[in-house]
UniProtKB/Swiss-Prot annotation:
Residues 197-200 are annotated as: Aspartate. CDD domains: AspRS_core, EcAspRS_like_N. SUPFAM superfamilies: Class II aaRS and biotin synthetases (SSF55681), GAD domain-like (SSF55261), Nucleic acid-binding proteins (SSF50249). The gene is aspS. The lineage of its organism: Bacteria, Pseudomonadati, Campylobacterota, Epsilonproteobacteria, Campylobacterales. HAMAP family: Asp_tRNA_synth_type1. It is found in: Cytoplasm. Homodimer. GO terms for cellular component: cytoplasm. This is Aspartate--tRNA(Asp/Asn) ligase. It catalyses: tRNA(Asx) + L-aspartate + ATP = L-aspartyl-tRNA(Asx) + AMP + diphosphate. GO terms for molecular function: aspartate-tRNA ligase activity; aspartate-tRNA(Asn) ligase activity; ATP binding; nucleic acid binding. ATP binds at residues 219-221, 228, 476, 528-531. It comes from Sulfurovum sp. (strain NBC37-1). Keywords: Aminoacyl-tRNA synthetase, ATP-binding, Cytoplasm, Ligase, Nucleotide-binding, Protein biosynthesis. Pfam families: GAD (PF02938), tRNA-synt_2 (PF00152), tRNA_anti-codon (PF01336).
Amino acid sequence: MRTHYCADVNEQHIGETVTVAGWVASRRDHGGVIFIDLRDKDEVFQLVCDPADNADAHKIAEEVRDQFVLIATGKVRARGEGLENPNLKTGKVEMVVDSLTIENRSKPMPFELNDEKVNEEIKLKYRYLELRTQKAYDTFKLRSKATIATRNALDELGFLEVETPILTKSTPEGARDYLVPSRVHGGEFYALPQSPQLFKQLLMVGGFDRYFQIAKCFRDEDLRADRQPEFTQIDVEMSFCDQEDVITVAEKLISDVFIKCGFDVPTKFNRMTHSEAMEKYGSDKPDMRYDLAMVDVIDIFERCDNEIFSGIAKMPKKNRIKALRVPKGDEIFSKRQMKGFEDYVRKFGAQGLGYFQMKEDGLKGPLTKFFTEDDIQAIIDRCGLEVGDAVFFGAGEKKLVWDYMGRFRIYLAETMDIIPEDTFEFLWVMDFPMFEVEDGKVKALHHPFTQPKSLDFNDIEEIESIAYDVVLNGTELGGGSIRIHKEDVQEEVFKLLGISEEEAQSKFGFLLDALKFGAPPHGGFALGLDRMIMIMTGASSIRDVIAFPKTQKAQCLLTQAPSEVDNEQLKELSIRVRQAAPTA
C-alpha cells in the first residue's frame, strides 16, 4: 500500500516515485496549487497537487479536508530555494502528486489537536484523536523504548520473565481491592492484584531465583496527578540476596533504561536514612535538585523566654522545632510575602511560622526579644546564617512539623524558581520504620511481608525494616525490601499488626504454608513505569503517559466505564444491586 514512511523520504529519493499514507494535518490552496501536509505516525511530508502536473489528483485534492485519510503516489523533488522547513526531517523535499486516493473522510475535529488549553474531559472522550499528535506518539515511542530496555537489562542479569495471576484472592495491602464476582462460585469474589507481591515470593520458594514482570496492578483509591486505578510496574524479585545485592540490580536497571532512552544519569545513587530525610527535608521522598535543608534548634528554643516555644521544646521525643535557612531570603522576600508564607503553612495545620532576618547589625525579627545574645548567636551558627539571609521556624508535634515544613520547602523552591529542569537526582531512602501507629492502630509502613531488622523493642515505632525507596526529583519512583522468609517471624509480624491467627490463615494461609517448605532468603523491588515515563517526558499528569487513562473519578470517558450491566448478567453472578445512598 505504501513504499515509505513520511520520515524516511529525503534528498536521496529526489527523482524517485514513492507512495506514502497518512492523515491530513493541513491543506492550503495557493492560487490553484494545493499543498497538503500529510502526517503518519511520526512525521509530516508536503504533497503538491498542481493541475498542470495531474488534473485528476488536483480534482481529488479539492475535496480533501483536515484529518482525511490519504494514500499518495508521486515523484520526490527538492523544495524551492527559501521554502525548506528545517523543523522537519522531510523539510528539504516534497512530492509532486501523480495519484491521490481518499481512503476515508473525517468529520470536523471536536477540538484542535495541538491546543494544550482544550478541556481535558473532551480530550479523554476522544482520546484516540489526541493520540494522533506528535507529542503523544513521541511519548509512547519513549515508553516502548523504556519497556524494551527493561526486558533487555533484566535478561542480561539472568532474570526470568514470569506472568502472575490477574484474578486472585482479596488480601488488602492498604488500598481497597477491585473485586470480581465468580459466576461458578456464587457469592464469592476474586480480586484484581494491587501488586504481584505474594506470587513473586512464592516463585522464590519455587526456586526460580530471579524473576521479573512488567505487571498490571489495580488499586481502588482516591486519585491524584500521579495515580491511576490501574497502573504498570516493573516488578523484580531475587533469592539468596541482601539489601546491597538488590540495590545493585536496581541501580543497574534504572541507569540502563534511562541511558538507552537518551538521558544522562549516574550509575550509582546517593543514600539517606528515612530519619535523616524526615528531619532535614520533612519528607520521605525529598527532591534533591536543590538544597534548603532544615536544622534542629529545639535545644536552643528550650532556653527562650516564651512559654509556648519552651513548652514544646521540653518534649523533644514528641515534638520538633525546625529552622529552614533561605540564602538571601531577606533580600528576596517582602514583608507581604513573609505573611503569605504563614498563611500557606496554616493550611496544613501549622499554628504559625516564625522567622528571623539576618541584617548587617545582627539577627532581627519579632522573636529575637525572647532570646539571650548567646542563644541568638547559637541560632546564627547552627543555621549558618549570612547577611541577607532569612530563616523560618516551625514548631509543634513532629509529624505535623515535618509535613508542613516539608511542603513549605517545596513551596519556597517553586516561589524562588530554583528547581533546575532537565536534571535527574536519584536518592535511596533507607531504614524505614517497620510500623506506624495511627489512632492507636498499628500499621505496616510498607507491607507486612517486609523483614524487620529486629523484633526486640521498647517502642514499636522504633523497629526498623530492611526496606528502601528510590526517589527521583521528589517523586517515589519505586521501592522494595528484603522479605520475611521464616514462618515464625511472619506470624509474629501479623500478631503485632493485630491480625489474629484465624484471619492470618484465612487471608495468607497459602503464604504461611509455603514458608514451611524451605523458603530462601529473598528480596526485591518494584518501579512505577508510568511515573518513570511521566518524569522522563516532563508530563504534568500520569494520564498523559497512559494510552487510555481514567479520570480523577476513575471513569473512562471514551467507553463510559464503569457502566450498569443488565439484570441477566447480575442474576448469573448471584448479585443484587442496592441503590447507593446519595452523596452530599
